[in-house]
């Protein structure tokens, strides 16, 4: 598996809401661990972070009915600066600056807007600044309702020339069966292709604030597979496995998606 990483120069790390918030509180210890991990990754790779969690972070300060979309957008508006403050504070401990970029999927549908965003990313990375991208939840709807930024992270990886998308989630890999209902379920180590049925199964997000599930992660993987890209799905609760793979080249757990052609 170490050979897969030889050509990897730039990675997108996407972290889900369920990692960032725990029991209606921002999980400061996980953000601290994540920022330590990002600092370590930056010694080997160019790193772009795609974060979820703005709605969940906002809810920790003001409870609202999230089934009403304007409330959800208001929560995102409150939560985003909370997240950025924590990222900024923790990354500063490692001498790293970060920058906020709020995007929507339609920003990447426009060639002009994509080029503008790409140019900004390149300048930030050239100065060792970590771009932190989130969906512009205050105005966008699609990812806010369903996706938890999984699809956005795949678009970011593709359009901003990353060699690998790393999704850190409460789902620690792509299982042969549902691990919550089957004791025989095992994690697939490598996946080269996905079937149409894999991409339309019912999504069952584990966290009340998460809007995705395994299906949106598989859809992100499929998007990249079709374009010769790679994706690695691993636990965001226990970063040592992702660390072993990305920094040590040892693939013990988690699922790596790549086409045989791209390998």
UniProtKB/Swiss-Prot annotation:
EC number assigned by the record: 2.7.2.11
One GO CC term, this protein: cytosol
Transferase as UniProt keyword: yes
Family matches, as InterPro entries: AceGlu_kinase-like_sf, Asp/Glu/Uridylate_kinase, G5K_ProB, Glu/AcGlu_kinase, Glu_5kinase, Glu_5kinase/COase_Synthase, Glutamate_5-kinase_CS
Pathway(s): Amino-acid biosynthesis; L-proline biosynthesis; L-glutamate 5-semialdehyde from L-glutamate: step 1/2
Record-listed ATP binding positions: 14, 169-170, 211-217
Cofactor annotation: Mg(2+)
Keywords recorded for this protein, A-Z: Amino-acid biosynthesis, ATP-binding, Kinase, Magnesium, Nucleotide-binding, Proline biosynthesis, Transferase
Pfam families: AA_kinase
Catalytic activity: L-glutamate + ATP = L-glutamyl 5-phosphate + ADP
Disulfide bonds, paired cysteine numbers: none
GO biological process, one term: L-proline biosynthetic process
PANTHER family reported for this sequence: GLUTAMATE 5-KINASE (PTHR43654:SF3)
Assembly information from the UniProt record: Homotetramer; oligomerization is not affected by L-proline feedback inhibition.
Assigned protein family: Belongs to the glutamate 5-kinase family.
Protein name in the entry: Glutamate 5-kinase
Native source species: Leishmania donovani
Gene name of this polypeptide: G5K
């Amino acid at each position: 598996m170490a050979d897969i990483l030889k050509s990897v120069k730039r990675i997108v790390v996407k972290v889900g809401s369920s990692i960032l918030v725990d029991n209606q509180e921002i999980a400061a210890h996980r953000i601290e661990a994540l920022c330590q991990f990002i600092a370590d990754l930056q010694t080997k790779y160019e790193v772009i972070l795609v974060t979820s969690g703005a709605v969940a972070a906002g809810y920790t300060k003001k409870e609202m009915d999230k089934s009403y979309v304007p409330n959800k957008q208001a929560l995102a508006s409150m939560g985003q600066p909370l997240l950025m403050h924590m990222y900024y504070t923790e990354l500063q401990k490692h001498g790293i600056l970060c920058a906020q970029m709020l995007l929507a999927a339609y920003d990447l549908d426009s060639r002009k807007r994509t080029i503008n965003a790409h140019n900004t990313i390149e300048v930030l990375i050239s100065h060792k600044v970590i771009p932190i991208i989130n969906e512009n939840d205050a105005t966008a709807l699609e990812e806010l309702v369903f996706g938890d930024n999984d699809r956005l992270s795949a678009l970011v990886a593709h359009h901003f020339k990353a060699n690998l998308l790393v999704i850190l989630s409460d789902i620690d890999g792509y299982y042969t069966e549902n691990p919550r209902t089957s004791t025989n379920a095992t994690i697939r180590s490598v996946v080269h292709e996905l079937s149409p049925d894999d991409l339309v199964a019912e999504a069952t997000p584990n966290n009340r604030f998460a809007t995705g599930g395994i299906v949106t992660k598989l859809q992100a993987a499929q998007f990249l597979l079709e374009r010769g890209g790679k994706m690695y799905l691993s636990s965001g609760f226990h970063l040592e496995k992702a660390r072993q793979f990305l920094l040590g080249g040892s693939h013990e757990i988690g699922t790596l998606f790549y086409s045989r052609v791209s390998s």
